[in-house]
């Protein structure tokens, strides 16, 4: 499915800090330089917005970023999950087993639920086409099919 795609995990610990908007702008410059390639960004400007709001009580205006992204025909796929603390605890255990260093930044399930609520609120303000998918149950072929249809790949 991802043949020919380039993937960037953009959340490298700088969103929600004084460097967050610089990171967003640099990735945006990179996207504009690579505009003829298929690129997946894991967490981008919406994450900067959520982190600034939750952790610094600041509103981040991402309208200019989205204007530039719109010119690139960018789309957003927001993965959501059931707001079930037991499910979140299980996912955290799995992640920490795979990546033990994640334990240093892992949060309580209630914090992930709070973040998700912010994501779901702010996505409605996006100028970009977006799709919200529930990733509570994985693997999930219907979820994959929905994403491919949204992207025009199926």
Label each residue range with its predicted role.
Residues 59, 67-118:
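A glycine- and Lys/Arg-enriched "phosphate-lid" helix/loop adjacent to the NTP-binding pocket
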Residues 45-47, 81-88, 138-139:
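Conserved nucleotide-binding/hydrolysis micro-motifs of P-loop NTPases
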Residues 1-38, 50-53:
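Conserved substrate/cofactor phosphate-moiety recognition/catalytic segment
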Residues 20-28, 55-65, 108-117, 144:
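Well-ordered, non-membrane alpha-helical segments in soluble/globular domains
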Residues 52-53, 88-93, 145:
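Short aromatic-enriched loop/helix-cap "lid" or pocket-rim segments at secondary-structure transitions
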Residues 97, 116-154:
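NTP-dependent small-molecule kinase module
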Residues 1, 40, 75-79, 131-133:
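Hydrophobic/aromatic beta-strand patches that form the interior of the parallel beta-sheet core
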Residues 27-72:
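A basic- and aromatic-enriched beta-loop-alpha substructure that forms the phosphate/nucleotide-
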